[in-house]
From Swiss-Prot:
Glycosylation sites: 93, 140, 200, 237, 289, 331
Protein name: Endoglucanase 1
EC number: 3.2.1.4
Gene: eg 1
Catalytic residues, chain numbering: 176, 284
């Protein structure tokens, strides 16, 4: 009986310890370019620390030292890294890159956590003034102003060459491609993967699908991600799928109430991942401080923990420039954010105090990966508590 119980305990431990990486999305690096009149060039290149910033080191300290998070998804804009005057590719704005690298190094070197590099561009380039809809679709050969698939690969080859010695850096190929052919999403992803590996970078890659890379829609529609996204090739077999999943009625994350059951809506994706022997991160999810979201957010986090296909997550969103504004709930936009110390517009506690601490923080695994390279198979789980 002792052997039976020992084997059972081992199986149960393996089944429950599937989350290796947990944290927050750091959103502010993409700020400062939006224009109500969709005026190209608005906010470019922008003033670092005034129009945009990547992280608050003090907030990262709180999330690592007190909340014991080991993953941060750091947003940036392609147009700031690769100015439109020179085009998408290997020519970087070195001043901007240095600011970005400083943030990534603080997370990974100083704090010993992991960082996802997040080009927050919706598979578009040259005009972020009306995101997520402005700009030319990368690889669209019918648009003479569009950056090419080859240029996208060149960009990723250059970026990877600058981080290939940092095993704690994860390459998130693109935020939320949408309204384009899934075959083009695959082609762009593959160009990036090929260039990253050619740059002698063995880092973990996370790869998006089409239709805002939504988990609920992964197998749906006439051109679903599920039909093609399993055809990518990575010679190192170190690429995971990047998923976003919100719980409001239209899956946008823009409403106060959570009404979409994650177990039901992720079932088809989870089956697809299992069938194709793939792993996934959910790098965007979140909700308001409503009762419905307080009930359903744990359902999503527990679903990931209970299904071995999911190995990491980042909640949307923290970031130094949110102020009282909210990364959720466009019908009530000033509830604060997941940034420590955030407050709502009326001075009451923000989403960090009303959602993160009471709802999400208790579900952060007590053991996460704190050493070794990020990978689809994870690493040794240890506690920092």
């Amino acid at each position: 009986m002792k052997l039976v119980f020992s084997a059972l305990a081992s199986l149960l431990s393996g089944a429950s310890a599937t989350i290796y990486y947990a944290g927050v999305a750091e959103s502010s690096g993409e700020f400062g370019v939006w224009s109500a009149t969709q005026t190209p060039g608005t906010g470019l290149p922008g003033r670092f620390g005034v129009d945009y910033a990547f992280i608050s080191e003090a907030a990262v300290d709180v999330h690592v030292d007190q909340n014991h998070l080991n993953l941060f998804r750091v947003a940036f804009l392609l147009e700031r890294m690769c100015p439109p005057a020179t085009g998408l590719g290997a020519a970087f704005n070195e001043t901007h890159f240095d600011y970005f690298k400083e943030a990534v190094d603080y997370i990974t070197v100083t704090k010993g956590a992991y960082a996802i590099l997040d080009p927050h561009n919706y598979m578009r380039y040259n005009d972020p003034s009306y995101q997520p809809f402005s700009g030319s679709v990368i690889g669209n050969t019918s648009d003479s102003t569009a950056a090419t698939t080859e240029q996208f690969g060149e960009f990723w080859g250059e970026l990877a060459s600058r981080f290939n010695d940092n095993e704690r850096v994860i390459f998130g190929l693109m935020n939320e491609p949408h309204d384009m052919a899934t075959s083009l999403v695959l082609a762009n992803n593959q160009a990036a993967i090929d260039a990253i590996r050619a740059a002698n970078a063995s880092n973990l890659i996370i790869m998006p699908g089409n239709s805002w890379t939504g988990g609920h829609s992964w197998t749906e529609g006439s051109d679903p991600s599920s039909a093609l996204l399993n055809q990518f090739k990575d010679p190192l077999n170190n690429t995971a799928i990047d998923i976003h999943e919100y719980l409001d009625y239209d899956f946008s994350g823009g409403h106060l109430e959570c009404v979409s059951d994650p177990e039901t809506n992720l079932a088809a994706l989870t089956a697809w991942l299992k069938e194709n022997n793939l792993k996934a991160f959910i790098t965007e999810f979140g909700g308001s401080n409503s009762t419905s979201c307080q009930e359903m957010l744990p359902d999503l986090i527990n679903y990931m923990a209970d299904n071995a296909e999911y190995i990491g997550w980042t909640a949307w969103a923290a970031g130094p420039f949110w102020g009282p504004n909210s990364p959720c709930c466009t019908n009530s936009t000033q509830l604060g954010s997941l940034e420590p110390g955030s407050t709502a517009v009326d001075g009451s506690p923000g989403l960090y105090d009303t959602v993160w601490l009471p709802v999400i923080q208790p579900l952060v695994p007590t053991e996460l990966q704190w050493s070794g390279p990020a990978s689809i198979s994870g690493g040794e789980l240890t506690s920092r508590a």
